[in-house]
């Protein structure tokens, strides 16, 4: 297969034509090849507009949904971002192409090691990966993040994650039941309260942890 062509078509038809217009996000999708993050036997489906299984009961998300979440985050070049749910590492790599530094947490050790190996193979130096309960946020040190992206469904906003946002920081998270959610964009206001905006409906795997399911 011509993966380069498939990648360009994905960006044009699945992202641009559905309202993803942030050039930083579109350029990241062109640089990061999705087929490198899926199982070999599923490579031919890598650029289809659908989630794919990656093992351990987890999936790599639909390209459009990832693009939408990244666009909602309003990412800037100097941002420091926390990702909850490394999974295959695909979204992590997209983030790493856009922002200065990405911290990412994965609860499954097998997926975490696989993603870490992939980051090293591809030469990423601005990704810090830890295994743990992502609902608690980054516990290794005190950091305030410009953005937080959560790649699993929560019943509500986990308080530890909101507390780790900078004033003016943004979080994008699917919130709802175990079977259907809506993307929420959470902004931390000057007074410490949250502004909530609603986006598309979606279906993510449950966010497992102390402040999740």
UniProtKB/Swiss-Prot annotation:
Disulfide bonds: none annotated. It is found in: Cytoplasm. It comes from the Bacteria. It is an enzyme of class 2 (transferase). GO terms for biological process: methylation; protein modification process; protein repair. The keyword Cytoplasm applies. CDD domains: AdoMet_MTases. The keyword Cytoplasm applies. Its EC number is 2.1.1.77. One of its GO terms (cellular component) is cytoplasm. Catalyzes the methyl esterification of L-isoaspartyl residues in peptides and proteins that result from spontaneous decomposition of normal L-aspartyl and L-asparaginyl residues. It plays a role in the repair and/or degradation of damaged proteins. This is Protein-L-isoaspartate O-methyltransferase.
């Amino acid at each position: 297969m011509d993966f380069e062509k498939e990648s360009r078509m994905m960006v044009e038809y699945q992202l641009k034509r559905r309202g993803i217009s942030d050039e930083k996000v579109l350029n990241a999708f062109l640089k990061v090849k999705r087929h490198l993050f899926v199982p070999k036997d599923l490579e031919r489906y890598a650029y289809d507009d659908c989630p794919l299984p990656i093992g351990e009961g987890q999936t790599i998300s639909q390209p459009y949904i990832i693009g939408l979440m990244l666009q909602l985050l309003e990412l800037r070049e100097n941002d420091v971002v926390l990702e909850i749910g490394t999974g295959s590492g695909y979204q992590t790599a997209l983030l790493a192409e856009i922002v200065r530094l990405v911290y990412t947490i994965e609860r499954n050790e097998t997926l975490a090691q696989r993603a870490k190996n992939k980051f090293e193979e591809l030469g990423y130096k601005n990704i810090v990966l830890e295994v743990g309960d992502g609902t608690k946020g980054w516990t290794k040190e005190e950091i305030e993040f410009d953005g937080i992206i959560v790649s699993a469904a929560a019943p509500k906003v986990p308080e530890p994650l909101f507390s780790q946002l900078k004033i003016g920081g943004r979080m994008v998270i699917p919130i709802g039941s175990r079977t259907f959610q809506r993307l929420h964009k959470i902004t931390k206001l000057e007074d410490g309260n949250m502004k909530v905006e609603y986006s598309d409906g979606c279906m993510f795997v449950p966010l497992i942890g102390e402040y999740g399911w």
